[in-house]
Amino acid sequence: IVSQINGVANEYKVNFYTSQLTKDGKQSKLYDSYSKLPEMVGRKVEIDGEIRENRYYSTNLNQLISTQLLAGKFVKGVVETAIDTATFVVGGFLVKTPVERRNKKDEVYRYDVTLGQSNYAGNGMSMITLHINPDHAEIVRAVEGMYGVGDTIQFTGSLVFKTEVVTVE
Protein backbone atom coordinates (compact mmCIF):
# COMPACT_ATOMS: atom_id res chain seq x y z
CA ILE A 1 0.00 0.00 0.00
CA VAL A 2 1.41 3.38 -0.98
CA SER A 3 0.11 6.62 0.51
CA GLN A 4 0.98 10.30 0.89
CA ILE A 5 0.56 11.45 4.49
CA ASN A 6 1.49 15.03 5.41
CA GLY A 7 3.55 15.29 2.23
CA VAL A 8 5.57 12.15 3.02
CA ALA A 9 5.42 9.05 0.84
CA ASN A 10 4.70 5.93 2.91
CA GLU A 11 4.75 2.32 1.85
CA TYR A 12 3.10 -0.41 3.91
CA LYS A 13 3.33 -4.14 3.28
CA VAL A 14 0.01 -5.64 4.34
CA ASN A 15 -0.47 -9.42 4.41
CA PHE A 16 -3.87 -11.00 3.74
CA TYR A 17 -4.52 -14.64 4.59
CA THR A 18 -7.58 -16.80 5.01
CA SER A 19 -8.65 -20.35 4.24
CA GLN A 20 -10.74 -20.99 1.15
CA LEU A 21 -13.29 -23.03 3.10
CA THR A 22 -14.90 -22.48 6.49
CA LYS A 23 -15.01 -25.16 9.22
CA ASP A 24 -18.39 -26.19 7.77
CA GLY A 25 -16.84 -26.73 4.32
CA LYS A 26 -18.50 -23.65 2.80
CA GLN A 27 -16.72 -21.05 0.67
CA SER A 28 -15.23 -18.34 2.92
CA LYS A 29 -16.60 -14.83 2.30
CA LEU A 30 -13.19 -13.40 3.21
CA TYR A 31 -11.58 -15.65 0.60
CA ASP A 32 -14.04 -14.36 -2.00
CA SER A 33 -13.19 -10.79 -0.96
CA TYR A 34 -9.42 -11.40 -1.12
CA SER A 35 -9.68 -12.96 -4.58
CA LYS A 36 -10.83 -9.52 -5.80
CA LEU A 37 -7.77 -7.68 -4.41
CA PRO A 38 -5.97 -7.56 -7.81
CA GLU A 39 -8.89 -5.47 -9.10
CA MET A 40 -8.06 -2.82 -6.47
CA VAL A 41 -4.46 -2.24 -7.55
CA GLY A 42 -3.99 1.47 -8.25
CA ARG A 43 -7.20 2.42 -6.42
CA LYS A 44 -7.61 4.05 -3.04
CA VAL A 45 -8.61 1.58 -0.32
CA GLU A 46 -9.44 1.41 3.35
CA ILE A 47 -7.99 -1.53 5.28
CA ASP A 48 -8.82 -2.75 8.77
CA GLY A 49 -6.42 -5.24 10.27
CA GLU A 50 -3.97 -5.85 13.06
CA ILE A 51 -0.33 -5.63 14.03
CA ARG A 52 0.75 -9.23 14.47
CA GLU A 53 3.86 -10.96 15.77
CA ASN A 54 5.54 -13.60 13.65
CA ARG A 55 7.81 -15.71 15.85
CA TYR A 56 10.04 -18.54 14.60
CA TYR A 57 13.25 -20.35 15.48
CA SER A 58 16.26 -19.71 13.23
CA THR A 59 18.56 -22.71 13.02
CA ASN A 60 21.17 -20.52 11.27
CA LEU A 61 21.29 -18.06 14.17
CA ASN A 62 20.36 -20.63 16.83
CA GLN A 63 17.83 -18.25 18.36
CA LEU A 64 14.18 -17.26 18.43
CA ILE A 65 13.36 -14.51 15.91
CA SER A 66 10.40 -12.17 16.36
CA THR A 67 9.11 -9.89 13.63
CA GLN A 68 6.00 -7.75 13.39
CA LEU A 69 3.75 -7.54 10.38
CA LEU A 70 0.59 -5.82 9.28
CA ALA A 71 -2.19 -8.34 8.74
CA GLY A 72 -5.13 -7.06 6.73
CA LYS A 73 -8.60 -8.30 7.54
CA PHE A 74 -11.15 -6.18 5.68
CA VAL A 75 -10.50 -4.05 2.61
CA LYS A 76 -12.84 -1.81 0.65
CA GLY A 77 -12.51 0.82 -2.04
CA VAL A 78 -12.97 4.48 -1.11
CA VAL A 79 -13.36 7.66 -3.16
CA GLU A 80 -10.15 8.90 -4.78
CA THR A 81 -10.52 12.25 -2.99
CA ALA A 82 -10.30 10.60 0.46
CA ILE A 83 -7.39 11.91 2.52
CA ASP A 84 -4.69 9.30 3.17
CA THR A 85 -4.35 8.30 6.83
CA ALA A 86 -2.69 5.44 8.66
CA THR A 87 -3.69 5.03 12.28
CA PHE A 88 -3.67 2.24 14.82
CA VAL A 89 -5.21 1.22 18.11
CA VAL A 90 -3.42 -1.54 20.01
CA GLY A 91 -3.80 -2.75 23.55
CA GLY A 92 -2.27 -5.33 25.82
CA PHE A 93 -0.38 -5.64 29.05
CA LEU A 94 2.88 -3.81 29.61
CA VAL A 95 5.70 -6.39 29.35
CA LYS A 96 8.52 -4.09 30.47
CA THR A 97 9.08 -0.44 31.17
CA PRO A 98 9.95 1.76 28.15
CA VAL A 99 13.50 1.29 26.84
CA GLU A 100 15.56 4.20 25.53
CA ARG A 101 17.46 3.42 22.30
CA ARG A 102 20.62 5.37 21.45
CA ASN A 103 22.72 5.55 18.29
CA LYS A 104 26.53 5.54 18.06
CA LYS A 105 26.57 9.29 18.78
CA ASP A 106 24.75 8.52 22.06
CA GLU A 107 21.62 10.35 20.84
CA VAL A 108 18.18 8.98 21.71
CA TYR A 109 16.56 7.97 18.43
CA ARG A 110 13.50 6.15 19.81
CA TYR A 111 11.83 4.58 22.82
CA ASP A 112 10.56 0.99 22.74
CA VAL A 113 7.38 -0.01 24.56
CA THR A 114 6.54 -3.72 24.51
CA LEU A 115 2.98 -4.99 24.96
CA GLY A 116 1.91 -8.58 25.47
CA GLN A 117 -1.33 -10.04 24.19
CA SER A 118 -2.79 -13.41 25.15
CA ASN A 119 -4.79 -15.50 22.72
CA TYR A 120 -8.42 -16.31 23.52
CA ALA A 121 -7.56 -19.84 24.68
CA GLY A 122 -5.06 -18.41 27.16
CA ASN A 123 -2.31 -20.78 26.04
CA GLY A 124 -0.26 -18.46 23.81
CA MET A 125 1.12 -14.96 23.84
CA SER A 126 2.29 -12.41 21.29
CA MET A 127 4.50 -9.41 21.94
CA ILE A 128 4.20 -6.16 20.01
CA THR A 129 6.89 -3.48 20.29
CA LEU A 130 5.88 0.10 19.59
CA HIS A 131 8.55 2.67 18.74
CA ILE A 132 7.98 6.15 20.09
CA ASN A 133 9.69 9.11 18.46
CA PRO A 134 11.87 11.04 20.95
CA ASP A 135 9.96 14.18 19.93
CA HIS A 136 7.04 12.62 21.83
CA ALA A 137 8.90 11.70 25.03
CA GLU A 138 5.86 12.90 27.03
CA ILE A 139 4.15 9.65 25.99
CA VAL A 140 6.99 7.66 27.53
CA ARG A 141 6.84 9.74 30.73
CA ALA A 142 3.08 9.12 30.94
CA VAL A 143 3.57 5.36 30.55
CA GLU A 144 6.32 5.34 33.20
CA GLY A 145 4.26 7.49 35.58
CA MET A 146 0.89 5.77 35.24
CA TYR A 147 1.54 2.10 34.40
CA GLY A 148 3.55 -0.76 35.80
CA VAL A 149 4.62 -4.05 34.28
CA GLY A 150 1.53 -6.24 33.89
CA ASP A 151 -0.93 -3.33 33.69
CA THR A 152 -3.32 -3.19 30.73
CA ILE A 153 -2.69 -0.26 28.41
CA GLN A 154 -4.00 0.96 25.04
CA PHE A 155 -2.19 3.10 22.47
CA THR A 156 -3.70 5.07 19.61
CA GLY A 157 -1.48 6.77 17.09
CA SER A 158 -0.18 7.32 13.59
CA LEU A 159 1.20 4.25 11.89
CA VAL A 160 4.74 4.44 10.57
CA PHE A 161 5.81 0.89 9.77
CA LYS A 162 9.50 0.48 9.00
CA THR A 163 11.62 -2.58 8.43
CA GLU A 164 14.75 -2.44 10.54
CA VAL A 165 17.67 -4.87 10.59
CA VAL A 166 19.69 -4.80 13.80
CA THR A 167 23.27 -6.05 13.65
CA VAL A 168 25.00 -6.78 16.93
CA GLU A 169 28.74 -6.15 16.68
Sequence positions of predicted segments:
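OB-fold and OB-like single-stranded nucleic-acid-recognition modules
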Residues: 1-169
